[in-house]
Amino acid sequence: MTNNSVSLHRVIKASPEKVFRAFADPVAHSTWLPPYGFICTIQQMDFKVGGKFKMTFINFSTGNGHSFGGEYLEIKANEYIKYSDKFDDPNLPGEMTTSIWLNKVSVGTELKVVQEGIPDVIPAEMCYLGWQETLEKLIKLVEPEIPDA
């Protein structure tokens, strides 16, 4: 972890295709992306290079939310996603860039996340904690293999 950036690494017992789908599908994305205690509403999600997204994280305890949006900069199916985003709140200035690598390994997918340009008013450790929770939720979504009845 360096100032204004965080880096995370996980190995997930699911295929890169399944993990990638969790990023690409708006309904799936809204279930695992917000940290614990938050819900997510997606107003726009055009998952393609140059496509825009807009969403809101809502604190379930207080009902207060913060909105943010951005653009998908690079997408390579089942391998790589890069997007920019910024908060609507003028007190959280600047644009962040997030890069996600998916690498097929013997037990599933090696996932690496790097987020850069985090606003100075957000402590990096708070952002890191949020990402840890987010990735726990992602893992709980993609690791189970549930057959159709």
Model-predicted regions and their roles:
Residues 24-25, 34, 77, 142-144:
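Residues at helix-coil transition
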Residues 3-9, 16, 52, 67, ...:
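Intrinsic-disorder/low-complexity, polar/charged segments enriched in Ser/Thr/Lys/Arg/Asp/Glu/Gln
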Residues 30, 36, 44, 58-105, ...:
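Hydrophobic-ligand binding "helix-grip"
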Residues 19, 23, 29, 53, ...:
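Hydrophobic pocket/interface hotspot
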Residues 1-39:
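Hydrophobic ligand-binding cavity/cleft-lining segments
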Residues 46, 51-55:
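N-terminal glycine/threonine-rich, aromatic-flanked beta-hairpin/loop signature
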Residues 110, 117-149:
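A conserved amphipathic terminal alpha-helix motif
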